Amino acid sequence: MKNIAMKTTVVLTILLLSVLTAINADTMKKRSDYCSNDFCFFSCRRDRCARGDCENGKCVCKNCHLN
């Protein structure tokens, strides 16, 4: 009986870890692909640019001052 409980615990632990890993990978992918005009605007303002637009999933800063 003890052996069956141990095997069940190991299997459930492995399943839980695989689910958590899949969720984390999906979350990280969404974060790296995240792009919105508001996010780009504030990101580009930090770099002293007047505008920031989301184009093709990437932030594009416009009207930047280089000093």
From Swiss-Prot:
Paired cysteines (S-S): C35-C54, C40-C59, C44-C61, C49-C64
Positions of the propeptide segment: 26-31
Annotated compartments: Secreted
Keywords: Cleavage on pair of basic residues, Disulfide bond, Ion channel impairing toxin, Neurotoxin, Potassium channel impairing toxin, Secreted, Signal, Toxin
UniProt main location, coarse: secreted
GO cellular component, one term: extracellular region
Tissue specificity statement from the Swiss-Prot or TrEMBL entry: Expressed by the venom gland.
GO molecular function: potassium channel regulator activity; toxin activity
Signal peptide: 1-25
Family per record: Belongs to the short scorpion toxin superfamily. Potassium channel inhibitor family.
Its job: Blocks Kv1.1/KCNA1, Kv1.2/KCNA2 and Kv1.3/KCNA3 voltage-gated potassium channels.
Protein name per its UniProtKB record: Potassium channel toxin alpha-KTx
Lineage: Eukaryota, Metazoa, Ecdysozoa, Arthropoda, Chelicerata
